[in-house]
Curated annotation (Swiss-Prot):
Pfam families: Mur_ligase_C (PF02875), Mur_ligase_M (PF08245), MurD_N (PF21377). InterPro entries: Mur-like_cat_sf, Mur_ligase_C, Mur_ligase_C_dom_sf, Mur_ligase_cen, MurD. One of its GO terms (biological process) is cell wall organization. SUPFAM superfamilies: MurCD N-terminal domain, MurD-like peptide ligases, catalytic domain, MurD-like peptide ligases, peptide-binding domain. The keyword Cell division applies. It comes from Chlorobium limicola (strain DSM 245 / NBRC 103803 / 6330). This is UDP-N-acetylmuramoylalanine--D-glutamate ligase. One of its GO terms (cellular component) is cytoplasm.
Length: 465
C-alpha cells in the first residue's frame, strides 16, 4: 500500500502504536497519534523526534480526519473511538497489517492460544542457524515483544520475519500474507474481548491465513478439535498447502500429503516418499524443556522450518540445544529437595492443565489472579492425581478455594510472597512447587513477566538456591 501523502491516525501511543507511527511517517504519510492516557517518556520523545503531532488524555474528532487508522492491539473494537472510526467508514488496520505493507522478507506467522512464543522462539533459533549457512537474517517480531514496524525496513528479500501474532493483532489484518502460517491450538481465552463467543475468537485467529495463496503453507495442530474440524480432510478446498502435526500415529491419516508427528518416543515426518525419523523426543525433553506441550511446540517449529526449506539436520541441532523460554514452565531452582517452577505465562486454564500434566510427581500448586470466567472443573482429574495442595491468590482466590474444596488441600494467601512462604512450609522433599496461575496478572501485577520475576525473587529471598 502506498501511504505517501495520506493522512494516518494512530490510536494508542504505546510500543506498537509509536512504532507504526514512526514507520508511516518515514514512508511519507501525514501521521497523527491519539492516546487515551499519556504516552510514556520514551514514546513521547520518539514522537517528538519524528515531528509527529499527538494528543493525550482522550480522543478528539481529529482522529477521524484520516484516510486510514492504525489501532494498538490493546484497544477493543467496542471502544468508543473505534466505533466512531468504523461508523465513518474509515479503514482500520493493526500495526502488523501496516508493517506488512513494507515487508520485502519472507514471513512465518505463528498464532494460537498457547505455545506461540515458544514455537516462535524455536523457529527463530532454527532460522538463525540456517541463516548463518545460507546468508540471510532471521528477525523475531510481533507479540513476542519487538513491534514488526520497528524492524521491517531493515529486512531484505532473503531474510525471514518470524512474527508472533495474538488474536488482537490479527483482528486488523486485511492483506497480511505469511509464506508459512502456524496455528498451535485454539482454546477458550480472552473471551471477554469476544462477548464470550468462541467462534469470534477463532475467527480472529483464522485471519492469519486469509490472504495465503497456493505457494504458501499452513501448519496446524491436528490434535486440537477445532482445528481438526477446520482443516483435516485433504485441505477442505483451501488454496494453500496444509501440514498437520500431532501426537500419535493417527496424524498420517489426516488426509494431508505431509505431516509431523510424535509416536513411540520419536518425532517422525510423513512425506510422499514415506515416513522418516527426525529425532528422538528425549533429545530435547530435558529438565528445563519438558512436557507434552513442548512436543507440540517442537513439532510446530519443525513443520514450519521444513515448509521454509530448512534442512532437518539444521533444525534438529537447533532444537536439541534449546532450554526453554522465561516464565514458561521455567525451572527456577531446587531447594531442600523441592523443585520450584515458574509458569507465570499460564494465563488460562488450558495452559495450567498443560503444566500440571508436564510436571512429574506430587505438586504444590500456586494459582490465581484475575479470573477470565474460568471453568476449573476440567482440572479435577489431574488435581486429584497429582496436586497435594492448592494455594490461591488474587481476585480468583475465593472461587478457586471453593472449587477445589474437598478435591485436595487448599489455602489462601494475600500476596505472592505469602503464597511462596506457604508453599515452602507445605512442600516435602521430592515434590514440586508449581506457580501456574491460570489467570491474568492485572489484578496484582503490571503483566505476567513482572509476576514471574517477583515469584523468582521471592523464592531466592527465602534461601539462595
Amino acid at each position: 500500500m502506498d501511504v505517501h501523502g495520506k493522512k494516518a491516525s494512530i490510536i494508542g501511543a504505546k510500543r506498537s502504536g509509536v512504532a507504526a507511527a514512526e514507520l508511516l511517517a518515514k514512508s511519507g504519510a501525514k501521521v497523527f497519534v491519539s492516546e487515551l492516557g499519556e504516552p510514556g517518556a520514551s514514546e513521547a520523545e520518539r514522537l517528538a523526534d519524528c515531528g509527529i503531532p499527538w494528543e493525550q488524555d482522550g480522543h478528539t474528532d481529529r482522529v477521524c480526519d484520516a484516510d486510514f487508522c492504525v489501532v494498538s492491539p490493546g484497544i477493543p473494537r467496542t471502544a468508543g473511538i473505534i466505533r466512531r472510526v468504523l461508523e465513518q467508514g474509515i479503514p482500520l488496520y493493526s500495526e502488523i497489517e501496516a508493517a506488512s505493507w513494507f515487508c520485502k522478507a519472507r514471513i512465518a506467522g505463528i498464532t494460537g492460544t498457547d505455545g506461540k512464543t515458544t514455537t516462535s522462539t524455536l523457529l527463530h533459533r532454527i532460522a538463525e542457524a540456517d541463516g548463518m549457512k545460507n546468508d540471510y537474517r532471521a528477525f523475531s517480531v510481533g507479540n513476542i515483544g519487538v513491534p514488526f514496524s520497528s524492524l521491517v525496513l531493515d529486512m531484505a528479500p532473503a531474510d525471514l520475519a518470524v512474527v508472533e501474532l495474538s488474536s488482537y493483532q490479527l483482528e486488523g489484518c486485511e492483506t497480511f500474507r505469511p509464506d508459512v502460517s502456524v496455528i498451535t491450538n485454539i482454546t477458550p481465552d480472552h473471551l471477554d474481548r469476544y462477548n464470550g463467543d468462541m467462534q469470534l475468537y477463532a475467527a480472529a485467529k483464522f485471519r492469519i491465513y486469509a490472504s495465503q495463496r497456493a505457494s504458501d503453507t499452513l501448519v496446524y495442530n491436528f490434535d486440537d478439535p477445532l482445528l481438526r474440524a477446520q482443516f483435516s480432510g485433504n485441505g477442505r478446498g483451501f488454496p494453500f498447502r496444509i501440514v498437520p502435526f500431532g501426537i500419535g500415529n493417527d496424524v498420517p491419516g489426516s488426509g494431508s500429503e505431509e505431516a509431523f508427528f510424535y509416536d513411540e518416543g520419536m518425532i517422525r515426518h510423513l512425506t510422499a516418499k514415506g515416513i522418516s525419523e527426525v529425532f528422538s523426543g528425549e533429545d530435547f525433553l530435558k529438565s528445563s524443556f519438558r512436557g507434552r506441550h513442548n512436543i507440540y511446540n517442537a513439532l510446530a517449529a519443525l513443520a514450519a522450518a521444513a515448509a521454509l526449506g530448512i534442512e532437518e539436520s539444521v533444525a534438529r541441532k537447533a532444537i536439541s540445544g534449546f532450554s526453554g523460554v522465561e516464565h514458561r514452565q521455567e525451572f527456577v531452582c531446587s531447594l531442600d529437595g523441592v523443585e520450584w517452577i515458574n509458569d507465570s505465562k499460564a494465563t488460562n486454564v488450558n495452559a495450567l492443565l498443560q503444566a500440571l500434566d508436564a510436571v512429574p510427581g506430587s505438586i504444590v500448586l500456586i494459582a490465581g489472579g484475575r479470573d477470565k470466567g474460568n471453568d476449573y472443573t476440567v482440572l479435577f482429574d489431574v488435581v486429584r492425581r497429582k496436586v497435594v495442595t492448592v494455594i490461591a491468590i488474587g481476585e480468583a482466590r475465593e472461587k478457586i478455594l471453593q472449587v477445589f474444596e474437598g478435591i485436595t488441600r487448599t489455602a489462601g494467601a494475600d500476596t505472592l510472597d505469602d503464597a511462596v512462604a506457604l508453599a515452602r512450609e507445605s512442600a516435602e522433599k521430592g515434590q514440586t512447587v508449581l506457580f501456574s496461575p491460570g489467570c491474568a496478572s492485572f489484578d496484582m501485577f503490571e503483566n505476567f513477566e513482572e509476576r514471574g520475576r517477583l515469584f523468582k525473587r521471592s523464592i531466592l529471598a527465602l534461601n539462595p538456591c
